[in-house]
Amino acid sequence: MIQGVIQKIAGPAVIAKGMLGARMYDICKVGEEGLVGEIIRLDGDTAFVQVYEDTSGLKVGEPVVSTGLPLAVELGPGMLNGIYDGIQRPLERIREKTGIYITRGVVVHALDREKKWAWTPMVKPGDEVRGGMVLGTVPEFGFTHKILVPPDVRGRVKEVKPAGEYTVEEPVVVLEDGTELKMYHTWPVRRARPVQRKLDPNTPFLTGMRILDVLFPVAMGGTAAIPGPFGSGKTVTQQSLAKWSNADVVVYVGCGERGNEMTDVLVEFPELTDPKTGGPLMHRTVLIANTSNMPVAAREASIYVGVTIAEYFRDQGFSVALMADSTSRWAEALREISSRLEEMPAEEGYPPYLAARLAAFYERAGKVITLGGEEGAVTIVGAVSPPGGDMSEPVTQSTLRIVGAFWRLDASLAFRRHFPAINWNGSYSLFTSALDPWYRENVAEDYPELRDAISELLQREAGLQEIVQLVGPDALQDAERLVIEVGRIIREDFLQQNAYHEVDAYCSMKKAYGIMKMILAFYKEAEAAIKRGVSIDEILQLPVLERIGRARYVSEEEFPAYFEEAMKEIQGAFKALA
């Protein structure tokens, strides 16, 4: 065991002497209280340690002991429905042990060592096993939790525990070389879990939000960023994704944001029902709370802890969504640690390796064939909080170069009460063409063409709005006024969505397609009517416009009949005008 002494303390960074032989990213116990820290730089026998707890009261000369192990998480049954801090300490059990404030140096196992799980073996003595294979299963909240062989273990099974109830500490399989396999294993957070191979992203990550699913889709196993200034709806958008997306498991990392936002999740999710299992939504969620009043250094760890837990569920064949709220706070933590270490700053004081760290994090997303031969996916959605909504700052620009979908939130839309406040002229998705075959097969053959038509109308409307602001709407011809009116219908009746409305909070692809078809059918008929000499004012008086406006509040079950009636009414109304 390597033991040194504290030489200097600078906020969360501690510099220790006499650490010859220690390795990068080893975990240390710092000071008399044994605070958790991680070595982030070595220089001769001097180690630079970032401490994941409050360093107030530490003194020069106190001991620093290296454990020789990297920062690792415990992966096994008992994580779902859990809430952890940034280094995977269970907050619920810390509260039972020390009260509502986290005592420094407190040691609590991430997984409950007392609870018994119903084990069903899937291997027998004599079987050859290797990393990623399923040893057995455990039921957890309606899920079948697969107990996996750790990725770096292989051998022949010597004995297997019969079906029954065991704790996570009891060995359930013993290999011939004496290796004991328990229901859980540990994995270093900075190392991506290995896979057989990555697959092309060709199925959509459906969110239930029309603007995202239709105009800016993200693929299952893709990456997306939600940049936006304060109050533009980043957190509500991410919580909507966590509630309604078609992922099996959601890992929600609150990284440096307000504590009340984690409280919202803790209050709302247990009351909402998961459409797949019928149980509370909280049962498919793992929360990592590392709020703004917690130590800065643990923000960096919380992002890695979250993505490692997501990879573990992916290795079981689940599709996992990782919500990181917000990556800007993580970047600010990097900046603070970097400045304490007196490293050379780059743009706006961020360290030069900011883009590399962001890329290494987003790179861990993907749709894969796991070591066990299953298909799983991790989709990462990261919020970015640029100060003052300035999209040219380094974190936003670095993220922009990495992610596949960019959902830009706009404060001016939020102030106009247009939610989700995603700016359709400033957002993009690189997954659209890859997902078109899926849409043609599963939604409708003409779906991509309708989406492109909607997109084109919005662009034309944006161009005409500039003219209107200069000379007023009377200077436009009827055909151009029609484009502006249809653009308004698309914005208000299609892109807007109420996250708190029982029907409108979630919209299926079939319903979104139906509303698109209604709006475009109206536009086509109106365009033909204007060519025949009908005035735009007559068209805008038609009662069918109200029916299109009400479509988003019609339930999924009633929508097909409503759609048929609306299409007949549109054709009938324009025949009457002729």
UniProtKB/Swiss-Prot annotation:
Keywords: ATP synthesis, ATP-binding, Hydrogen ion transport, Ion transport, Nucleotide-binding, Translocase, Transport. GO terms for molecular function: ATP binding; proton-transporting ATP synthase activity, rotational mechanism; proton-transporting ATPase activity, rotational mechanism. ATP binds at residues 228-235. The keyword Lyase does not apply. It catalyses: ATP + H2O + 4 H(+)(in) = ADP + phosphate + 5 H(+)(out). CDD domains: ATP-synt_V_A-type_alpha_C, ATP-synt_V_A-type_alpha_N, V_A-ATPase_A. GO terms for cellular component: proton-transporting ATP synthase complex. One of its GO terms (biological process) is proton motive force-driven plasma membrane ATP synthesis. Its EC number is 7.1.2.2. It holds the Pfam family ATP-synt_VA_C. Belongs to the ATPase alpha/beta chains family. NCBIfam families: PRK04192.1 (NF003220). Produces ATP from ADP in the presence of a proton gradient across the membrane. The V-type alpha chain is a catalytic subunit. This is V-type ATP synthase alpha chain. It comes from Thermus thermophilus (strain ATCC 27634 / DSM 579 / HB8).
